[in-house]
Amino acid sequence: MQTAVNEFLTPRHIDVSEITPTRARVVLEPLERGFGHTLGNALRRILLSSMAGCAIVEAEIDGVLHEYSAIEGVREDVIEILLNLKGVAVVMHGKDSTVLTLSKKGPGVVTAGDIQVDHDVEIKNPDHVIANITGNTELKMRLTIARGRGYQPADSRRRDDDESRAIGRLQLDASFSPVKRLAYSVESARVEQRTDLDKLVLDLETNGTIDPEEAIRRAATILQQQLAVFVDLEGEKQSAPEQKEEAIDPILLRPVDDLELTVRSANCLKAENIYYIGDLIQRTEVELLKTPNLGKKSLTEIKDVLASRGLSLGMRLENWPPASLKND
């Protein structure tokens, strides 16, 4: 099996070309035929939908009750402002969520750089335009930043009791993935006399919160961790849970001699291998009457003695005989 695995080519060359600070071209070769699309598609899906990042998920704008409002002295309506807020590239260090403020008096352009941040938060695209103030209006807002993965629509964060949510807290559809665009192609590669090999080319662009090369490295790590479980399909052998023996009434473990039956009745029971009270109560009247030398008088005696102890014939016991009797 190991020999068959070793026969596969593994990539020997990887070339990373930086096109811009947020865009890179990665070439990986040689790959066995078909593996270009196999790896390319897997990495693409992880990079676009499974990468963790930060995004603005909620906004409170002074004087705005809902997203269909307009702000006097601001060129954009509220929906446009919310769309622009989704384009802010933000990084948080050591936090899962935080609240930032923005305050800008016009006239002028409101950019991501106007957001007031603390030492744990970075805005990677400070020139990103959020709104344009055309008058002397002052635009104030509170922005909630959260950490997440992939794409999260606003509806998925709303609580069941939406009516209790404060008016004016506007929810944003959040795209946490730091990858803005990814395309891959598979070209032909050659190694010595083999010409049927693949070359994988990845063209990746991020929002600036992560280096393109680091993004690919993280995606490959995620893929590796998910596939590692298949390397050994046996996994850890789970031992069968020990079945705890149900507690048995101690009186059932006592010998039939303790019932102080007549010698005739006691001997008849022992002849039928009935040694314990637990053995006896599981027999029916019909079964006992078939016992040699045990008549109705002896049967009545047995029933009366059992009744005095709260027992009767024909009872059913689970897990009988118990292990303690089997080992005797």
Curated annotation (Swiss-Prot):
It catalyses: RNA(n) + a ribonucleoside 5'-triphosphate = RNA(n+1) + diphosphate. GO terms for biological process: DNA-templated transcription. InterPro entries: DNA-dir_RNA_pol_insert, DNA-dir_RNA_pol_RpoA/D/Rpb3, DNA-dir_RpoA, RBP11-like, RNAP_asu_C, RNApol_insert_sf. Residues 1-234 are annotated as: Alpha N-terminal domain (alpha-NTD). One of its GO terms (cellular component) is cytoplasm. Residues 248-328 are annotated as: Alpha C-terminal domain (alpha-CTD). Its EC number is 2.7.7.6. It comes from the Bacteria. GO terms for molecular function: DNA binding; DNA-directed RNA polymerase activity; protein dimerization activity. Keywords: DNA-directed RNA polymerase, Nucleotidyltransferase, Transcription, Transferase. It is an enzyme of class 2 (transferase). The N-terminal domain is essential for RNAP assembly and basal transcription, whereas the C-terminal domain is involved in interaction with transcriptional regulators and with upstream promoter elements. Homodimer. The RNAP catalytic core consists of 2 alpha, 1 beta, 1 beta' and 1 omega subunit. When a sigma factor is associated with the core the holoenzyme is formed, which can initiate transcription. Belongs to the RNA polymerase alpha chain family. DNA-dependent RNA polymerase catalyzes the transcription of DNA into RNA using the four ribonucleoside triphosphates as substrates. This is DNA-directed RNA polymerase subunit alpha. The gene is rpoA.
